[in-house]
Amino acid sequence: MAIIIAAPASGTGKTTITLALLAYLKAHALRVRSFKVGPDYIDPMFHAAVTGQGCVNLDLFLTDEPFVRATYHHHCRGQQAAVIEGVMGLFDGRAGQGDFASTAHVARLLRLPVILVIDGSGAGFSVAATLYGFRRFDPRVRIAGVILNRVGSERHAQILSEAVRSQGLELLGTVYKDETIALPHRHLGLVPVEELSDFRRTQQQLAALAERSFDWQKLLPLVAIQPTAPAPARWEAEPLPPVRIAVARDRAFSFYYQDNLELLAALGAQLETFSPLAGEWPDCRGYLLGGGFPELCAGELSAKTRFWEGLRGAVARGVPLYAECGGLMVLGEALRTPEGRSHPMAGILEASCWMGKRTVLGYRVATALHSSCAVEAGRQLRGHLFHRSRMEPQPGAPLWQLDDDEQEGWVRGNLHASYLHLHWGTQAWAARRFVRRCLAVAFEGKSTPARF
C-alpha cells in the first residue's frame, strides 16, 4: 500500500508534512518512492532531494488513467514505502470538470488511503464538521486518518483530537505551531531546493519533527508497499540507435518530468546534464532547455559567452533544441528582470522577455499549427502553463493554438520554443520524433538550418 497526503485546501502544510514523512523514512534507511499529484515541478525536486530518487508526477489531465496506474506501479517496484503528495484541496480538479484530475481522482484510481492534513490554527471543535463533510462527500475515497498542523497548545491539541475522534478517524500526528518548519516562498511557489544551501540541515529537522510528532506504529503499515503483480507497460518505446542529448540543469533550468527523461532514455537517448550558469556547452546532437527561473540569475547567465556561442551555433546548424518556459525566455534578444534591469540573451528570436505580475496558470489543450522537432502540424496535445513573463512581440507564425483562443510558441527549423509544459507519458510519439531528429544530426552530421 501507500498513502496520499491531502488537505481541505492549499496552504495547510501538505508539502512540509510530506517532506517530514519522507525524511523520517529515509533516515531509517527505507527505500521510499515519492509521487506528486498534478503538474508541479518544485515540490517534486524537494522530494527527490530527500529520497535520493526522482519524484514522479501523477497527472490525469496531462496523461490518462492507464498511464497513471502503470507509472505508479512501475516506480513502486523494489521500494519499501511510498508517499504521494496531493495537490490543492482533496477534491479540487480541473476548472469546470468537478474533481477530474484531483487528488481524490488519483486516490479512487489507485485505491489508496488518504491522510488529511488539517490546519488547526484558528479552529476548534468545528474541525469535526469539516471532517464529517470530507469523509462523506465521496465514500469511494477512504480517509485513513488525520494529521493536525499548526496547533497552538496542548489544550488546543486536546480539543482538535476530540473533533477527529468524534468522526471515527485515527489521529496520526500533531505538529505544533512553534515547531513548524517554514520553507521559503517566492512568486511561483517554493524556492527550489537547489537554491537552499542548508537544506541537509532542514532535512534532519524534518526527520526529527516526524519522529516526535507522528504515530509511526499506525503510519508504517500504511506507507509500506505490498508486493503487486507486474506493472503494465507505461508506453511503447522500441529503442532507437543511441544518441547524445544534453539536458540543461542548474539554478536557471531545472523543470523536467521524471517520466519524460526516462522515456527519452528508453528510446535510446544518452542524457548528459550541463550547467549554462557554469558556461558549459557539451557537444551533443540535441538539447533540452527546461523551465526554471532564469530571470533570477539573468545577469550571471548573460555573461556566459561559451554557452551563448554554443547555443547560437547549434540552432544555426539545425541541431534540435527543445525549450520550455524558462528555456524560451532566454532565446530572445533580452530578458528584463523583476527589478527592471535588462540583460542581453541569445538573440535567436526577434523578441524580448518581460517579467510581469500577472500569473498565467492552468491546463491547456493545444493544437500544433506548425511542425517542430517534437510535434507535427495538426496534432493535439495537453499541456500546462505557469509563468509570469511574456515574450514581445508575439510570433508571426505561432506554434500552438490553445483552447482559450490564445496562440503562442516559436518554431524555426529544428527549434521548438514554448511556454507550454508537456508530459510525454501518453504522447510518446513526440519524444520519439525529437529523438529521431537528433539522430538525423548524428548520422548525417547536419540537419535543416534554421532561418530567421
Curated annotation (Swiss-Prot):
Co-factor requirement: Mg(2+)
Highest taxon in the source lineage: Bacteria
PROSITE patterns registered for this protein in UniProt: GATASE_COBBQ
Single Gene Ontology MF annotation: ATP binding
UniProt GO BP: cobalamin biosynthetic process
Catalytic activity: cob(II)yrinate + 2 L-glutamine + 2 ATP + 2 H2O = cob(II)yrinate a,c diamide + 2 L-glutamate + 2 ADP + 2 phosphate + 2 H(+)
Gene3D superfamilies linked to this entry: 3.40.50.880, P-loop containing nucleotide triphosphate hydrolases
UniProt keyword annotation of ATP-binding present: yes
Annotated GATase cobBQ-type domain residues: 244-429
Keywords for this protein: ATP-binding, Cobalamin biosynthesis, Glutamine amidotransferase, Ligase, Magnesium, Nucleotide-binding
Pathway listed: Cofactor biosynthesis; adenosylcobalamin biosynthesis; cob(II)yrinate a,c-diamide from sirohydrochlorin (anaerobic route): step 10/10
Entry EC number(s): 6.3.5.11
Domain observations: Comprises of two domains. The C-terminal domain contains the binding site for glutamine and catalyzes the hydrolysis of this substrate to glutamate and ammonia. The N-terminal domain is anticipated to bind ATP and cobyrinate and catalyzes the ultimate synthesis of the diamide product. The ammonia produced via the glutaminase domain is probably translocated to the adjacent domain via a molecular tunnel, where it reacts with an activated intermediate.
Additional information: The a and c carboxylates of cobyrinate are activated for nucleophilic attack via formation of a phosphorylated intermediate by ATP. CbiA catalyzes first the amidation of the c-carboxylate, and then that of the a-carboxylate.
HAMAP family cross-referenced by the UniProt entry: CobB_CbiA (MF_00027)
Family designation: Belongs to the CobB/CbiA family.
Protein name per Swiss-Prot or TrEMBL: Cobyrinate a,c-diamide synthase
